[in-house]
Amino acid sequence: MGSDELYRPLYVTDLLVNALNQDPDRPLLQLLGGPMLTVGEVRDETSRYVQALARLGVGRETRVALLSANRPEVLHVSHAVQILAGIIAPLHPLGSAADHLYLIQDAGIEILVFEGERYSERAAELARGAPGLRLASFGPSPIADDLGTLAAGLSPQPLVAPRVEGPDVMRLGCSGGTTGKPKSLTTSQRVCMAMFNVMLAEWEWPNPPRVLTCAPLSHSGAALALPALLKGGTMLVLPGFEPVAVMQAIQEHRINCTLVVPTMIYALLDHPRFGEFDLSSLETVFYGASSISPARLKEAIERIGPVFSQFYGQAEAPMVITLLRKSEHDVNDLRRLASCGRPTPWAHVTLLDAEDRPVPDGRPGEICVRGPLVFDGYRNNPELNTTTFRGGWHHTGDVAVRDPGGFLRIVDRTKDMIVSGGFNIYPREIEDILSEHPAVAQAAVIGVPHPKWGEAVTAVVVLRPGQEVTPEALIGMVAERKGSFQAPKTVTFVASIPQTPLGKPDKKALRAKLQRDARPYP
């Protein structure tokens, strides 16, 4: 045996196949209302889809897009593409046709696998925009062969992990696109393995985890699937996020672990039936994807318990740049609750100024990362790669300050910073202050064009049910804490703040709406 084979590293698909080949009778995966699938049943279904996809021509480096709501087949198809050494490109089920088509065209997708019942019309639209795109469905569809029927007629065969190397592309996707057009990016085997190494080693998992996921399995909803498998746990999948369904599932299934975004936490706390459910089984609630109001996080800890664990990452360095552990959530210190935690020991992290020089504690700087967690670059965008990979660092675009204990507090995206009257204003700080008011459920702050100041600080606020507050009171609250130059010039009350498919406040949509509706400034 050659030394290259003797010391060949393991990658994500090795872990997946090894784990699926053990403990076949252990319960593993259940879609709410459906049967509980054992490890052996998931293994066999994965094997059937491996064979079915191979018959469609999927093999090494074949680019396969996947579009579906939450159902077990999402995991079966994703795992099968990995085992065939193909490249998976998940399409967010709530994404727009334009964004889906952008990824398909930019990444050169060859096959689209979709859920026939829900997405046949979208698949047909995408096929018209991408000539040569082959279609396959699970469930009947008038425009494609049923991959599920083909798979069901095949006999399970042993699963064997492919030989892959660290630089091999495993996944294609897009950045969130909150500041402009989505950016197509590639994620290698190395990056995915680094992410799971950190998650398995650093995240605070119950033993064993009983996981609830309500996020799309094509995206963050699947992030807990492999850890649940490796740690002897189970995963209950909901079709989507609905507060009562989530709380009911936690109570009935004694869920001890879940992953949410901040807006989901707010929706649970504000629901009139919150107090009806027993959530005491929860041991760890992972949360991330966008900033959280410290005041609302304090409320969540006081009402649900000290179970919250924050992760910070981005598509370009996924999930695990920093971690704020459960024990580090100090309800008596709102500055700590505003922190995204400390850098993982598995990555090099620093804060740099506009001239790429390290900044001291207490001074804003851009979070920059290097190490195996960093993605391999944007596709077909050499200019953006040049500005993102600079000076030996990946520049995240997030601005943070570091305290003497090493905790980072993100003050904003560099592109969200407001320049008003020559002053740099970070919306995150104003949002946190507004959210401390007992009448405020959620706040978003943006800059809109102003003839005198360049940009005017503008707040968009969602009130809690049955609560009232005047714009003047909120403006005065910010002025008292941050000075009049940082106080909003206007406050607009809305029923809800638009979100991206990933659950982040969609400030691009907010800016567009406010600029459309704006009256001329005096």
Residue ranges and their predicted role:
Residues 193-210, 218-257, 271:
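Conserved AMP-binding/adenylation subdomain of ANL enzymes
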Residues 55-56, 83-150, 465-467:
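Structural core segment of the AMP-binding/adenylate-forming
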Residues 36-40, 170-194:
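Conserved AMP-binding A3 loop
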Residues 9-10, 24-25, 137, 142, ...:
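Conserved pre-ATP/AMP-binding loop-to-beta segment of ANL
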Residues 342-346, 357-388, 425:
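Conserved ATP/PPi-binding loop(s) of AMP-dependent carboxylate-activating enzymes
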